[in-house]
Amino acid sequence: MDANVLIMAGGTGGHVFPALACAREFQARGYKVHWLGTPRGIENELIPQAGLPLHLINVTGLRGKGRLSLLKAPFMLLKALMQARKVVRQVKPVCVVGFGGYVTGPGGLAARLAGVPLIIHEQNAVAGTANRSLASFASRVCEAFPNTFAASAKRRTTGNPVRVELFLETPRQALAGRKARLLVLGGSLGAEPLNKLLPDALAQLPQDIQPEVFHQSGKNHDAVTAERYRNVGVEAQVAPFIQNMAQAYSWADLVVCRAGALTISELAAAGLPSLLIPLPHAIDDHQSRNADYLAREGAAFVMPQATTGAAEMAARLKEVLMQPEQLNSMARTARSLAKPDATNTVVNVCVEVAHG
């Protein structure tokens, strides 16, 4: 098929990884995929590695900026819009698909001005600034979590595209005649509060329920985190970054982590119970809303950072680790919330709009 698709996603892995999953599906269907990003985001590393043409526009966020930056903002946005319009004219896509990040605002408006169908996908339970603005004129609005956007004929609840290897057909039985296995995830850039909290909390557990521990600390935090575990007499494997997440998830019985949208979707895919500590300063507190998706169904416990010290974490760990059937029930519930067809569903929506 001689047709181009322009994907817009940038900044963080939470936007880029779901978009990459869809890019691969577009390619499998014969489309040529182009990517619109910004010079500062993770896309500059990942998209060339994926062999996709990357087009860049210069745009940054405005929240928390000083007065001078706000005064310059209209000129920055106008320049970014002109750059995005040039890319749209060059690529001539049958549709433009936005997955979030600063790039999607100018890119989405450029699609509208060019008369190209625009589809947006929101990964979080609370829509980002750009997607809220674009939703009013997008051809379709895809959401990972139900009711992120107001009900409309163009809304589709699709789930988050995640790597297919993460899906387990049936969650395995936790604590099957062995020690429990605890996976701690601080995010690819780490989460220092978790790096400090978990060693102290685990040190308070009775010896007979001490789990095996695999802790992702984030870049440059592995040595000091490993030292914290040694200082309190807890054995743990600490790594700055976990390359094979499918293997890590299949190993674990319980996960302690933040509540980014992609993490929530991966926990469901892998059928894993979790203790979720939402990032307290996330924009619009979207991580708390993400966490509620699993917690209200009984697949996770939410533990706000402000009220969770070592004693509180130790008490919760003790509760769940001493009740294997509760862990297994949480695992089954998590798996029931997974959307294994999310990637296909999003791409189907795009193809329908492009050729409908």
Curated annotation (Swiss-Prot):
Chain sites annotated for binding UDP-N-acetyl-alpha-D-glucosamine: 12-14, 124, 163, 188, 242, 287
CDD domains: GT28_MurG
A UniProt-annotated Pfam family: Glyco_transf_28
Location within or outside the cell: Cell inner membrane
Catalysed reactions, semicolon-separated: di-trans,octa-cis-undecaprenyl diphospho-N-acetyl-alpha-D-muramoyl-L-alanyl-D-glutamyl-meso-2,6-diaminopimeloyl-D-alanyl-D-alanine + UDP-N-acetyl-alpha-D-glucosamine = di-trans,octa-cis-undecaprenyl diphospho-[N-acetyl-alpha-D-glucosaminyl-(1->4)]-N-acetyl-alpha-D-muramoyl-L-alanyl-D-glutamyl-meso-2,6-diaminopimeloyl-D-alanyl-D-alanine + UDP + H(+)
Annotated InterPro entries: GlcNAc_MurG, Glyco_trans_28_C, GlycoTrans_28_N
Keyword tRNA processing: no
UniProt topology in membrane: Peripheral membrane protein
Listed GO CC annotations: plasma membrane
Annotated GO biological process: carbohydrate metabolic process; cell division; cell wall organization; lipid glycosylation; peptidoglycan biosynthetic process; regulation of cell shape
Keywords assigned: Cell cycle, Cell division, Cell inner membrane, Cell membrane, Cell shape, Cell wall biogenesis/degradation, Glycosyltransferase, Membrane, Peptidoglycan synthesis, Transferase
MF annotations from Gene Ontology: UDP-N-acetyl-D-glucosamine:N-acetylmuramoyl-L-alanyl-D-glutamyl-meso-2,6-diaminopimelyl-D-alanyl-D-alanine-diphosphoundecaprenol 4-beta-N-acetylglucosaminlytransferase activity; undecaprenyldiphospho-muramoylpentapeptide beta-N-acetylglucosaminyltransferase activity
Documented EC number(s): 2.4.1.227
Biological pathway: Cell wall biogenesis; peptidoglycan biosynthesis
Superkingdom field: Bacteria
UniProt key word Calcium: no
Function: Cell wall formation. Catalyzes the transfer of a GlcNAc subunit on undecaprenyl-pyrophosphoryl-MurNAc-pentapeptide (lipid intermediate I) to form undecaprenyl-pyrophosphoryl-MurNAc-(pentapeptide)GlcNAc (lipid intermediate II).
PANTHER family: GLYCOSYLTRANSFERASE (PTHR21015:SF22), UDP-N-ACETYLGLUCOSAMINE--N-ACETYLMURAMYL-(PENTAPEPTIDE) PYROPHOSPHORYL-UNDECAPRENOL N-ACETYLGLUCOSAMINE TRANSFERASE 1 (PTHR21015)
Protein name from the UniProt record: UDP-N-acetylglucosamine--N-acetylmuramyl-(pentapeptide) pyrophosphoryl-undecaprenol N-acetylglucosamine transferase
Gene name of this polypeptide: murG
